[in-house]
Amino acid sequence: MKKQICVGVAVLSLGAFAAHAQELGSPAQSRPLVKTDAVTYLFPEQVSVPAGKPSQVALHFRIAQGLHINSHTPSDEFLIPTTFSIPDGSGVRLDAATYPAGSSITLTYDPTTKLSVYTGEFIIQARLVATAGNHLVQGKLHYQACDQNQCMPPKTITVAIDVIGK
């Protein structure tokens, strides 16, 4: 009986070791990214704007270290652009959004291709038109985050802003 238990433990240990060794030896391109909060909305949380008149509001975001996101005008038609939107019916309309110019980078696996991306902190200038009153706006930032080896699936985060139309 003791011999059977020892053999069973040995087989399980070898299986776990083999699985761990495969994981360590797999190429970086096939490992999933573990970062889940690639982009964070920083501020403002609340803005006051004249009711019915277009007003510029600077929306501040931070990208996690080691990651980048495609700019609003990516260098390839197959890359997903960063976009900001506000849903209809919120009492606030996004009249226009001005995005920063992207930085040009090359990836280690393809130094011939230049990408237009955002890294670190970036600001989107949103021209908002609000009706009179207090509006909790649930804006949406849509982006795709990548590192030097691979990209995560596209993601949309909520950008909550209390817009007061006076």
Residue ranges and their predicted role:
Residues 1-9:
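Bacterial N-terminal signal peptides that target proteins for export
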Residues 8-16:
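Bacterial N-terminal signal peptides
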Residues 1, 17-19:
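Intrinsic low-complexity/disordered segments
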